[in-house]
Regions:
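Conserved lysine of the Walker
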Residues: 41-42
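Post-Walker A alpha-helix
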Residues: 45-46
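A basic/glycine-biased coupling hinge at the interface between accessory DNA-binding modules
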Residues: 2-11, 28-31, 36, 50-213
Length: 213
């Protein structure tokens, strides 16, 4: 097997089948790999990461590996470090929220954030929504905070700000008002929820791309 088709260690090389080796050593920049549970997705992803670096196709800080849980992210880092004799601290390996948080802390000015912005957990976010609703004299028996919270998070995850949401009925209009009030208070306090991390990171990247073209 040639250098271009080799992996970082014989142990990992022997643990991959032909299809997995093909996925790890693809020359294409983009590829969609479909695989079921327990099929070795993490092994392939981390081996691909290591292969790109070992063959000097990419630098450690230019490769992004994203997963859904902190446990999976830690496992990826351990597997990569087992194949590469380098410091993993500068690598972009983590969860969606974790990586967005790290990116925004690095580019807080471009993202219109204070340098030391804070992240609200689910309980804090719900409390913040309740405060906004109380200030607006919204009866929670008629419009539960849980429903409003779902509305806000869903729109943020779809990339929609309060000003962009089109409301056609009284309930939707009230939810939009609460969403807007929540945005204003969070911005003033220098805090944001988990969905805000994703949305603000997306907006910053789009804005940066538009400026560079």
């Amino acid at each position: 097997m040639s250098m271009n088709n080799s992996l970082i260690s014989d142990a990992y090389n022997q643990s991959l089948n032909k299809e997995q080796i093909k996925a790890v050593t693809l020359s294409e920049q983009s590829a969609l790999i479909l695989a079921g549970a327990g099929s070795g997705k993490t092994r392939v992803l981390t081996s691909r990461f290591a292969w790109l670096i070992q063959n000097q196709i990419s630098s450690p800080g230019s490769v992004l590996a994203v997963t859904f849980t902190n446990k999976a992210a830690k496992e990826m880092i351990l597997r990569i470090s087992a194949q590469l004799p380098i410091n993993t601290r500068g690598m972009w390996v983590g969860t969606f929220h974790g990586l967005c948080n790290r990116f925004l802390k690095k580019h807080y000015k471009d993202a219109d954030l204070p340098q030391f912005f804070q992240i609200l957990d689910s309980a804090d976010q719900k409390s913040a929504i309740k405060r906004v609703m109380k200030q607006m004299n919204v009866n929670e028996d008629l419009l539960p905070s849980k429903e409003v919270l779902y509305f806000i998070n869903t729109n943020k995850e779809e990339g929609i700000r309060s000003a962009e949401f089109k409301a056609f009925d009284d309930i939707s209009k009230k939810k939009k008002e609460i969403y807007n009030g929540s945005e204003s208070q969070c911005l003033k306090a220098g805090v944001g929820d988990f969905a805000e991390l994703l949305l603000r990171c997306l907006r910053q990247r789009k804005s940066s791309s538009a400026k560079s073209t």
